[in-house]
Amino acid sequence: MNLSLTFMTDVILALLLVMIAFWLPQLNIYTEKYSSYECGFDPMGSARLPFSMKFFLVAITFLLFDLEIALLLPLPWASQTTNLKLMLTMALLLISILAAGLAYEWSQKGLEWEE
């Protein structure tokens, strides 16, 4: 009874918040708010610098591989488990997925900085 009451309260509250969001007026977007502010002077140039898409892709690839390496860090402690065969199988599976991802990035020229 208590769980169903909590669930119903959550659903009703979520629906109420969604309905209120639809009824609220849209805010006006002012162009002055999106321009750069330089101490009261007119901006000398665009504040939005062009961003290298190649750098972004290399950074995302680094983050993904770094996360996968972080998943391998507990392996020395996991080797003390009773089911060593399963642990080694899962570790080799993770390493092979990591190697396959690296090979794919390399074959797609995702690691080369040339443009």
Curated annotation (Swiss-Prot):
Any one Gene Ontology molecular-function term assigned to this protein's record: NADH dehydrogenase (ubiquinone) activity
Location(s) in or outside the cell: Mitochondrion inner membrane
Catalytically driven reaction(s): a ubiquinone + NADH + 5 H(+)(in) = a ubiquinol + NAD(+) + 4 H(+)(out)
Transmembrane feature ranges: 5-25, 55-75, 86-106
Main EC class the enzyme belongs to: translocase
Annotated GO CC locations: mitochondrial inner membrane; NADH dehydrogenase complex
Keyword Transferase recorded: no
Assigned EC number: 7.1.1.2
Membrane topology per record: Multi-pass membrane protein
GO BP term, example: mitochondrial electron transport, NADH to ubiquinone
Main location: mitochondrion
Keywords, ordered alphabetically: Electron transport, Membrane, Mitochondrion, Mitochondrion inner membrane, NAD, Respiratory chain, Translocase, Transmembrane, Transmembrane helix, Transport, Ubiquinone
A Pfam match: Oxidored_q4
Family to which the UniProt record says this protein belongs: Belongs to the complex I subunit 3 family.
Assembly mode: Core subunit of respiratory chain NADH dehydrogenase (Complex I) which is composed of 45 different subunits. Interacts with TMEM186. Interacts with TMEM242.
Biological role: Core subunit of the mitochondrial membrane respiratory chain NADH dehydrogenase (Complex I) which catalyzes electron transfer from NADH through the respiratory chain, using ubiquinone as an electron acceptor. Essential for the catalytic activity of complex I.
Protein name according to UniProt: NADH-ubiquinone oxidoreductase chain 3
